[in-house]
Each structure stands twice: as structure tokens, then as C-alpha cells.
Amino acid sequence: MPHTLNKNIDFFIAALSQTYISALQLDPDGMYAEVASGIVEQFSDEQVRLRRYDGSVSHYARDNTKFQRNKG
């Protein structure tokens, strides 16, 4: 079952544990779609920086992106 990351402590734990998380944004139909997944490299109250599988880096705003990790 997915766990949504909301608080700074959630992102801190994900970064320390090097857990892959998914970044989801609303599509035109109003459904959440995955736009990226990766490891949290840096975060602030405004944005999260993810390092993807291929090594590229992307930034996502926390106010319009939902972040989830899957519980195993």
C-alpha cells in the first residue's frame, strides 16, 4: 500500500534510507499520474529534488506534486 510523504520528516527518512519514491501530478482528467521516480537528494518546504534511475535530476514543487513510496 502506498505511503504519501507530506512532512519534512517523511522526506528526511526517505533521503536517509535511499528509498525510491514516486512523484505524481494531476493529469487533464483530474487523475494522479506518475511523472517521475527516484531518490530524494534534497528537499525544502517548497520543492523536492529527485535523482532518477538514469542519474538525471529533477525538481518538483511540493504544492502541486504528490510524493509516495510503496510499503513492501
Regions found by a protein language model. Name each.
Residues M1-A33, D54-G72:
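Short glycine-rich, low-complexity segments
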Residues E41-Y60:
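Basic/aromatic-rich interaction segments and small domains that mediate binding to polyanionic partners
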Residues E34-E41:
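Short beta-strand-centered aromatic/proline hotspots
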Residues Y20-S22, S37, R49:
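Beta-strand secondary-structure signal
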